[in-house]
Swiss-Prot record:
The keyword Cytoplasm applies. Belongs to the SPAN-X family. It comes from the Eukaryota. Residues 1-46 are annotated as: Disordered. Keywords: Cytoplasm, Nucleus. This is Sperm protein associated with the nucleus on the X chromosome D. It comes from Homo sapiens. A motif (Nuclear localization signal) lies at residues 37-45.
């Protein structure tokens, strides 16, 4: 079989699996279907969206005496190490028409 070039310029001696002769190609539309009308544009006031975003952090301060891990002391962690719990809530409201 002749060598074929791929997109990367590397010569291949066998065709790709997707080029098998028994593979069926999906049929495309012939273009004779009725065209769909373009969606009607709404006024800005009717299509407004309200986003409410809430973000909260809880900080737990750890004093140097509470740091028991020697590895943490070797890495010079800030004496007031902060552990934070975070969450984000996003709510989308679409006004009724």
């Amino acid at each position: 079989m002749d060598k074929q070039s791929s997109a990367g310029g590397v010569k291949r001696s066998v065709p790709c699996d997707s080029n098998e002769a028994n593979e069926m190609m999906p049929e495309t539309s012939s273009g004779y279907s009725d065209p769909q009308p373009a969606p009607k544009k709404l006024k800005t006031s009717e299509s407004s969206t309200i986003l409410v975003v809430r973000y909260r952090r809880n900080f737990k301060r750890t004093s140097p005496e509470e740091l028991v891990n020697d590895h943490a002391r070797k890495n010079r962690i800030n004496p007031l190490q902060m552990e934070e719990e975070e969450f984000m809530e996003i709510m989308v409201e679409i006004p009724a028409k």
